[in-house]
């Protein structure tokens, strides 16, 4: 099994480590300073307070003739189309897009070819410290496993094989029917959370700001109530908790989560490092919400 990780940030590096540990033939494609570090030191990561080096091949360029069983595209939303263009002529058949985006999957297929895209989203978080060492982890299964689906919503040989490699790598996963709806609901949650950090005077201690926590709770209730009304369902179903929890309880839960080690690793670190991406996703998400609202009024 040959796997290419396109993108050597936190998410790409962690999946490369996990696949390499499993024994898969794993390569990771990097650029710039990250490439320089990896070429010199290898893919270093922290595990049980020890520093280890993953048995992964470091690539600074790609050949169209290099065929992989799976390519995992782990880049930011604003890097997506450049990456797809570079992979357009690659011989590999399956590109797993682990990207925050509300774009139509057809636009992606128009670039790389129909049937090659497997939309997905990672269940992981963490950071790469100033020494270039990965300190990351998978999110607990009950919170957010690696999620994916065929564009059609049907099961396929692609989803079967991807499930198999995730299972062998001990990576929690779930298959859904409508990946676009899942990503829309995901953004309904993470956009207000990121906004809270950006609005706080001290982002690292945003959970201490009761006013911001209450505002964030209101945004979450509003987002999910609107989506439920528009789509008739939420994905996954557990997102309905944001609709039903009383505002005071949700505010307290948010404050506790923001101040926890979980909040630091899986929420704060990403919001801090990907502020440009999250601000752009904020614009896209609320523009999409406005579009849905206007379409509903036209029907009425």
Task: Please provide the spans of the model-predicted regions.
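Rossmann-like NAD(P)(H) cofactor-binding subdomain of soluble oxidoreductases
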Residues: 50-135
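Rossmann-fold dinucleotide-binding core
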Residues: 106-182
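NAD(P)-dependent Rossmann-like dehydrogenase/reductase catalytic/cofactor-binding core
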Residues: 228-300
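Helix-loop-beta segment of a Rossmann-like dinucleotide-binding subdomain
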Residues: 135-149, 198-208, 261-272
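Active-site-proximal catalytic alpha-helix in oxidoreductases
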Residues: 180-207, 211-224
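Hydrophobic anchor at the start of a short beta-strand
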Residues: 3, 25-26, 95, 117, ...
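Flavin-binding catalytic cores
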Residues: 164, 212-237
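NAD(P)+-binding Rossmann beta1-loop-alpha1 motif at the extreme N-terminus of oxidoreductases
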Residues: 1-53
């Amino acid at each position: 099994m040959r796997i290419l990780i396109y993108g050597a940030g936190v998410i790409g590096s962690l999946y490369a480590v996990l696949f390499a540990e499993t024994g898969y033939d794993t390569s990771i494609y990097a650029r710039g300073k990250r490439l320089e570090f990896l070429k010199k030191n290898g893919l270093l990561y922290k595990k049980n307070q020890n520093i280890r080096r993953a048995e992964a091949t470091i690539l600074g360029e790609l050949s169209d003739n290099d065929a992989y069983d799976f390519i995992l595209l782990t880049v930011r939303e604003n890097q997506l189309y450049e990456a797809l263009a570079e992979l357009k002529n690659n011989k590999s058949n399956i590109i797993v897009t682990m990207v925050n985006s509300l774009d139509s999957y057809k636009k992606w297929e128009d670039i790389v070819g129909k049937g090659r895209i497997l939309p997905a989203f990672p269940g992981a978080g963490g950071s790469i410290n100033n020494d270039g060492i990965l300190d990351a982890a998978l999110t607990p299964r009950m919170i957010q496993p690696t999620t994916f689906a065929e564009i059609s919503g049907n099961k396929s040989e692609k989803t079967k094989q991807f499930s198999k490699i995730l299972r062998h790598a001990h990576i929690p996963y779930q298959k859904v029917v409508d990946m676009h709806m899942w990503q829309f609901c995901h953004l309904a949650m993470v956009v207000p959370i990121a906004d809270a950090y950006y609005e706080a005077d001290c982002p690292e201690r945003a959970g201490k700001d009761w006013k911001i926590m209450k505002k964030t709770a209101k945004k979450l209730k509003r987002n999910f109530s609107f989506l439920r009304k528009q789509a008739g369902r939420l994905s996954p179903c557990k997102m309905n908790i944001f609709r039903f929890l009383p505002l005071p309880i949700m505010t307290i839960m948010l404050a506790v989560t923001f101040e926890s080690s979980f909040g630091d690793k899986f929420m704060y670190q990403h919001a801090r490092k990907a502020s440009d991406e999250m601000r752009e996703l904020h614009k896209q998400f609320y523009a999409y919400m406005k579009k849905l609202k206007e379409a509903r009024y036209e029907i009425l």
